[in-house]
Every structure is written in C-alpha cells, then in structure tokens.
Amino acid sequence: LPGKVLLNAGGKALLAYHIERLQWSGYPVIVATTTEKSDDIIVEFCEQHRLPYFRGDEQNVLSRFYECALHFGLSVIVRVTSDCPLIDGTLIKNAIDAYLLAGNLQIYASNCLVRTYPRGLDFEVFSMTLLEEANKKASLPSQKEHVTPYLYQNKSANTILKHITNQQDNSQFRITLDTIEDYQLIKILIEDYQAAILPTSAIIEVLTQHPELQAINAHIEQKKI
C-alpha cells in the first residue's frame, strides 16, 4: 500500500498515531528511514514533529538499523515496523523493563515468534551487542531486509530467545497496515471507536463485539519472510 504511513484518519497521519502510542513507553522514539527521495516526506514529517530520525540503505535494513543505533549511541534497541499505527507502547514498556531486569545482553525478546497478540502490535527487544553481530555475520538477503532473522533463527549460539506472550490468544485479529482493507479497518477504529487512545485490550473488545469489523480484513494472508 504506497505511502501508507502518511494516510489520514481522523485528521492526522497514521504515522502520528504510531509515534504517539510508542511514546506511551516513556522511551525515545527514532525513525529509521531511507536515503531515497521518496522518503523525503517522512523526513519532513519528523522535522515538523521534532522527531529524531536517521537515513540509511533502503534494501539492507539491517545495516540501516545498525548505523542508526551507532549514530545515536544506543545500547538496547526496540524494533517496530511502520505498519503498526495502533501498537501499544505500554506493552513495550513492560517488555523493556523485564529485559533490563534480566540484565543479559544475549536475550532477544519478541512478541511475534509465538503469536498471541493481534498482528500489528509486533516488537522486538535486543542489545547493540546482538545487532552488531547480526550486522557483521548475516549473509542472506532476507536476513538483511528483515533485520532480525539472523538472531531468532538462532544462527548465533549466543542468542537466548525470550517469547513475550499474552494470557489469551488474540492472534486472529489483524490491526496492521498492509492493504486497503487494513486501512479501512484502522480508519473506522480510530474515527468511530477512538482506538488511537485505547489500550490493546479495549481495541480487542471492540473487534470482539463487532465481528463485521474483523471481517473487513480477515481474508488477508500475511506475507511470509
């Protein structure tokens, strides 16, 4: 879906909602975009909203993330993708707190390997140590495009996988942004149900009570890596 992150709902770009919800975590949010001219508009958005950003390679997203983390002096990285405008920063904060409490730089924590949350809430937490290793050793195009496969496919004996799961399996719900149907659903959720300010549990409740909403994009098959 071209230009999807700047599509409008309720008078604002979806990227604005995404950033606002990420800020619930209490941690800095950095936009890692590309050097392509087509992404100048993303940079303009960041500058208008005073958001830190980094521009890197379009295809090798792994190198872009590594160089971004290096540029900003990060020791821990939370990776999210821009197609999740209703992501929940509170869930991310809880995951970061647990990660920091564990105090092990070899942990890769994610809520998307064992899927119990709706698609569209995906996040990964890992150290600069692991990101640096992946950047040095990843060789497959898929590992470079999707950033973390080298880590979670356990190509490194150093990685400890930590699955973040929900008590209830809500993986049947889809609130990601890949297709026009996804956009239609997200727009309705934001404009008619105030989803932009709701926690995940309340959004799930709306979808449960309104199966006609879930049906809008239920037929979409997610692309495989």
Language model regions located:
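Polar, enzyme-active/binding microenvironments
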Residues: 196
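Conserved core of the sugar-phosphate nucleotidyltransferase
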Residues: 29, 44, 87-173, 184, ...
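N-terminal glycine-rich phosphate-binding loop and ensuing alpha1 helix
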Residues: 1-33, 38
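Short, conserved phosphate/pyrophosphate- and ester-handling motifs at nucleotide-, phospho-/glycolipid
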Residues: 179
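Anion (oxyanion) recognition and catalysis
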Residues: 23, 47, 155
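Short phosphate-binding loop-to-helix
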Residues: 36-101
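Short loop/turn motifs at secondary-structure junctions
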Residues: 25, 73, 104-105
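Structural signal for conserved beta-strand scaffold positions within catalytic alpha/beta enzyme cores
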Residues: 8, 55, 79, 110-111, ...
